A protein has these predicted regions:
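Short, charged, surface-exposed loops that flank catalytic or proteolytic processing sites
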Residues: 88-94, 156-164, 182-186
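Glycine-rich phosphate/dinucleotide-binding loop and adjoining beta-alpha-beta core of small-molecule
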Residues: 1-131, 203-207
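Short pre-catalytic strand/loop immediately N-terminal to key active-site residues, enriched for Gly-Thr
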Residues: 128-140
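N-terminal loops that bind phosphate or other acidic moieties
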Residues: 63, 124, 157, 181, ...
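Charged C-terminal helix
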Residues: 172-207
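Feature representing long, continuous alpha-helical segments
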Residues: 97-100, 127, 146-147, 160, ...
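Short, small-residue alpha-helix embedded
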Residues: 82, 138-169
Length: 207
């Protein structure tokens, strides 16, 4: 996405999508910055913003005021530190309030990832996710979460439910495989493997 023509092409591609997950594997190149800016300004579908897209936004917070449609952000503590210009220690002192402040300030759903993930909505409602384990603090785990949330966003058409259910399902998938991997052996693909078990459990329960 390097010029007006490619930006227009991206806008056309967005027209067939029901939701967009942007950030994982993106980098902070000039092309990536233009892509993030184009998506935020033009997308007329819900967005899930993660990883490098958050890092790009942290250098220009005005971008987060550009969105037309519902947005879910999924920062870990380091990304939230850059977004809020606060130390990780300060965030951890009152993580629930920080998540709520960010959600309200930018009119987004904030999924702030920590040992207990906080989901905060702009209307003040908050959830604390109790599924998951320390083995999930592994490279790519957050990418899996953003993908789950994006998929649920399309199915449920509800940003709050997509964020809260997504965090719970992601954690539950990690719990499902913990006995086989332990806390040190778990990798992101193990969490994906655990999703099969989660969906089977959900279907058996009729939900």
């Amino acid at each position: 996405c390097t010029d007006i023509a490619s930006a227009k092409a991206l806008e056309t591609e967005l027209e067939w999508a029901d939701a967009v997950v942007i950030g994982p594997g993106l980098s902070k190149s000039d092309n990536a910055k233009m892509l993030v800016e184009t998506v935020l300004k033009t997308a007329e579908i819900p967005l899930v913003i993660d990883a490098d897209a958050l890092n790009i936004i942290s250098d220009n917070m005005i971008l987060l005021n550009e969105h037309k449609m519902p947005v879910i952000v999924t920062p870990h503590l380091g990304e939230m530190s850059r977004l809020m210009k606060k130390s990780i220690a300060n965030i951890q002192e009152d993580i629930i309030s920080v998540a709520g402040e960010f959600a309200s300030l930018y009119n987004v759903i904030c999924v702030l990832k920590d040992f207990r993930t906080i989901i905060a909505a702009a209307d003040g409602e908050k959830f604390i996710n109790l599924s998951g384990n320390c083995g999930m603090a592994t490279a790519g785990s957050g990418d899996v979460l953003s993908g789950i949330v994006g998929g649920l966003l399309v199915q449920l058409r509800d940003t709050k439910k997509a964020a809260a259910y997504g965090a719970f399902i992601h954690g539950l998938a990690g719990d499902m495989v913990f006995d086989n991997t332990g806390s040190y052996g778990m990798i992101a693909s193990d969490i994906i493997d655990g999703l099969d078990k989660v969906w089977i459990k959900v279907e058996k329960n009729g939900n």
